[in-house]
Amino acid sequence: MVQSHPRRGHFPAIRTKRVLDLSRSEVLDAVDADQIAYYRARAPWYDDGYACAGDYDGGAEQNARWLAELAAVERALGTAPIHGDCVELGAGTGYWTERVIERVERLWALDAAPEVLQTARVRLGARATKVHFEVVDLWRWEPRRRWDSAVAFFLLEHVPDEVLPALLATLHDALHPGAPLFVAEGAANDAEPQIETRSIDGRAYDVVERRRSPSEYERVLATAGFSVVSVAARRLMHLLATRE
């Protein structure tokens, strides 16, 4: 059974998981479209997850652990050598964008959902003048320039194994040699690629949920031409890599 939730947008407490054959292009395309539609619909309450609000409120102890994990990622970001012209893959509502723009000259914020980018634009206010917002389906990304650094927060866990190598290879080619890449993701919780079916207002959406281990990321990044410099993993994982 797929649990639905009201328009207020709380994340379903119960999620239906299944494995689909994403090697079939028609299945992959359908999941891509569904996932984009899901995040467009979820845009108004996306930040509940960061704020421990609504169905994300796990009580004082659990919320404190979650906020401590976010703070650890933010501290690691603060020491990462991101600089110059930077690209953020899957910028979402701008929670991390506003932390990145303090460190770089200019930022390109990419996301497939225009609604979340609009939220980011409002969040940033006058600081948005440093940001170029672009609606991009990253599963089919064709960049037309190069950047000095890159960041991705909680994006790659929503990219299936069938797409991730090509995405990272594309990112590699879009970065200058030696460019740093900072990544934050949920820690690995399952060895199998999963599709989660989530429901909003009675409509079910298929969303990729593929949390990889640090060793998996090291392997796929190395294949794409990156060297992992450091990695830390608890409830959340963050890593720093360099474009070779």
Where are the model-predicted features located?
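Class I (Rossmann-like) S-adenosyl-L-methionine-dependent methyltransferase catalytic domain
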Residues: V2-Q3, R7-C86, G92-R145, V159-V163, ...
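A conserved beta-strand element that flanks and buttresses the S-adenosyl-L-methionine
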Residues: V151
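Short catalytic micro-motifs in class I SAM-dependent methyltransferases
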Residues: F154-H158
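A short glycine-rich, Lys/Arg-flanked "PGG" loop and its adjoining helix->strand segment in the class I
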Residues: P165-P177
